[in-house]
Structures are given as structure tokens and as C-alpha cells.
A protein has these predicted regions:
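N-terminal Sec-pathway targeting helices
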Residues: 1-16
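Solvent-exposed, non-transmembrane regions of membrane-associated and secreted proteins
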Residues: 20-257
Length: 257
């Protein structure tokens, strides 16, 4: 009987050690990938910063590809034609390419710029948005601790942070543009109780547009003193918010230049 109990104890101990080792490996692997992908994004950003400012297409670039693309994004676009823009917020870690996969929604939720599986994913535009035409572009990014990816949006819960970071730079492949923040709010996704901000892409009319902006202002964590009018172009940056199940933190901004 004692031997039987001893065997059970040994087996239990081995199982616990195995589970601990497996969990430790998973955690190590996760943070190792976060560091690796962060470094890769930094290299991509450096490539953009060092790109020529001249708007002409390189002689070796295919005429049918990238001919209207801004010079600093041409090389990246030729590497991955799913790229539709670039987003950055001065004073934060947000400085990333923005992707869109119309035929495979949410593909970049778990894939990097090279289309390889990645915990961090890559910021991406909702599949039913038209980059050139839609009234509102919904852009998703993971909330990664340490302010990585769209984790930096967490700081916008503080009005004092907003006061120092009121603008967002969002460039399409063909145009550089600045956006002014209209509202920062929290909601719950996939719930009848939440605000389905992701359903608003193209306004049916002025009333529809004003209704969306009004709801954003109603839910806002604080008053920015900024609003949007029918005809303005909007972006909505969306990331996870952990105070509620399926919580979302959303930053809405309008194009100003």
C-alpha cells in the first residue's frame, strides 16, 4: 500500500514538473517572439525613415506595381501588396505598417508583415473598408503589454496623455495625412449591450454620420472639445480592453490635413 502511494506521489510530482516546464517554455517562447517581432517592426520603420523622399518609382520597379505609391513605402509595398498604409503616433511606440486582407478577414490578427504566424500580428484595416472611399476606416491592433502594438492606446484613458498626443499620422500608400482625435471610449464587442462601432464604415446620410459621432462622444472618457461633421473622413483605432469580457478601447479621429 505504501509503495502504491509512493508511486502515485512520484507520478503526480512528475506531472506537475512537466506542466510547469511546459508552461515555462510557452511563456519563454511568447516573450522571445514579442522581442523578435518588435525588432523586426523597428527594422521596417527604419527602412521607411531611410527611404528616398523623391516620388519617382525606382527604375527596377515593375511599372504596373507601386507606380502611384509614395517613395518611402514603395519597397515595402513590393514586398507585400496587402500593405495599405502606415500609422504612427509621436511620443508612443505606435509606428507600424497597416495591412488589409479582403479575402481573408482578420488574417493579420495573427500574422506578421511577412505573412508568418505571429502572436503580435500586424495592425490591419477591417475587410469591408475602402481605403480611398470609406467614411470610417476601422483599424485593429493587439493590446500587448509594455505599450507594444496598440497597447500604447491604453495611455489615452488619461486626458493628460491625450493633451500631449492629440494627433495621429495615418498615411495611405498614396497620401500622407494627419488626424485629430475626436473621442476615446470603452465598450464591449459582440454584445447587444455594447456599441457596434465596427459596423459604421460608410454613412448612409448625414443623420447616420452624426449618430455615429454622437455615440462616440456620449461614451467618451472625457471631452476633447473636438467633433466631426458630415463629410469628414474618420479612423477608429481598436484594441482589447481588459476591464470587461470582450472589452474594447477605441480612439476615433478625423482627417485634418
Amino acid at each position: 500500500m505504501k509503495n502504491y502511494k509512493s508511486i502515485i506521489c512520484v507520478v503526480a510530482a512528475v506531472c506537475l514538473l512537466g506542466t510547469a516546464a511546459f508552461c515555462g517554455f510557452r511563456i519563454y517562447h511568447y516573450y522571445a517572439e514579442v522581442d523578435e517581432q518588435t525588432e523586426t517592426f523597428e527594422e521596417i520603420a527604419e527602412m521607411v525613415e531611410q527611404a528616398p523622399t523623391d516620388e519617382t518609382v525606382p527604375d527596377d520597379a515593375p511599372v504596373s506595381e507601386g507606380e502611384d505609391v509614395l517613395a518611402k513605402y514603395q519597397k515595402l509595398y513590393l514586398q507585400n501588396e496587402d500593405m495599405v498604409g502606415w500609422i504612427s503616433i509621436a511620443g508612443t511606440t505606435i509606428n507600424y505598417p497597416v495591412m488589409q486582407s479582403r479575402n481573408n478577414p482578420n488574417f493579420y490578427l495573427k500574422h506578421n508583415f511577412e505573412k508568418e504566424y505571429s502572436y503580435l500580428g500586424t495592425p490591419y484595416v477591417q475587410e469591408n473598408c475602402d481605403i480611398a472611399e470609406s467614411d470610417n476606416l476601422v483599424i485593429y491592433g493587439h493590446h500587448i503589454k509594455g505599450g507594444k502594438m496598440f497597447g500604447a492606446l491604453e495611455d489615452y484613458k488619461s486626458k493628460s496623455f491625450y493633451e500631449e498626443h492629440k494627433n495621429i499620422q495615418f498615411d495611405t500608400l498614396t497620401e500622407q495625412a494627419e488626424y485629430e482625435i475626436v473621442a476615446v471610449f470603452k465598450t464591449v464587442a459582440y454584445s447587444s449591450e455594447g456599441f457596434r462601432y465596427y459596423d459604421f464604415v460608410d454613412a448612409e446620410n448625414e443623420e447616420d454620420f452624426n449618430s455615429y459621432v454622437g455615440k462616440c462622444k456620449e461614451l467618451a472618457l472625457y471631452d476633447t472639445g473636438v467633433t466631426a461633421e458630415y463629410g469628414d473622413r474618420l479612423i477608429a483605432l481598436s484594441t482589447c480592453e481588459y476591464s470587461a469580457q470582450n472589452g474594447r478601447l477605441v480612439v476615433v479621429a478625423k482627417k485634418v490635413g
